[in-house]
Amino acid sequence: MPSKNLINTLRADYPHIEFTPGEHFKWSASEKTVYFNARDDAGETFLLHELAHALLDHDDFDLDIQLVRKEAEAWDMTIAELSDKYGVDVDEKEAEMSLESYRHWLFMRSKCPDCGTNGLQTKNTHYKCIACG
């Protein structure tokens, strides 16, 4: 769970970002708020990950692959910069599992319901099968 000391330090270091307890970890670009679950055992890691989204100015995305790219960028920043800066041991396997869940989501989302081939995204939530046409 995120320590009060870490949360207070982040609030002091980033006064333009709100840090608010919530049910899930997430970054809201429109609200300029990092939401965090104060009871999660891996809370400090995920808190820094959501902070990375904020520092990278991540907001909406048009294509699903853009979301996966943003997740990878945020994990890279969490591991390479923020973990050392704030003295948080980031479990890189846990970070990779989190990123893998997005890759799996993208893989499943892009599968053609008729033939199972992965297609190409043409619009926000639409995919076109490269096998079926």
Regions found by a protein language model. Give the residues of each.
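Active-site scaffold of zinc-dependent metalloenzymes
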Residues: 1-43, 54-58
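Long, well-structured alpha-helical subdomains associated
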Residues: 8, 38-43, 84-133
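Poly-acidic low-complexity segments
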Residues: 18, 26-30, 37, 64-67, ...
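Histidine-centered divalent metal-coordination motifs
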Residues: 49, 53
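Post-HEXXH active-site segment of zinc metalloproteases
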Residues: 55-84
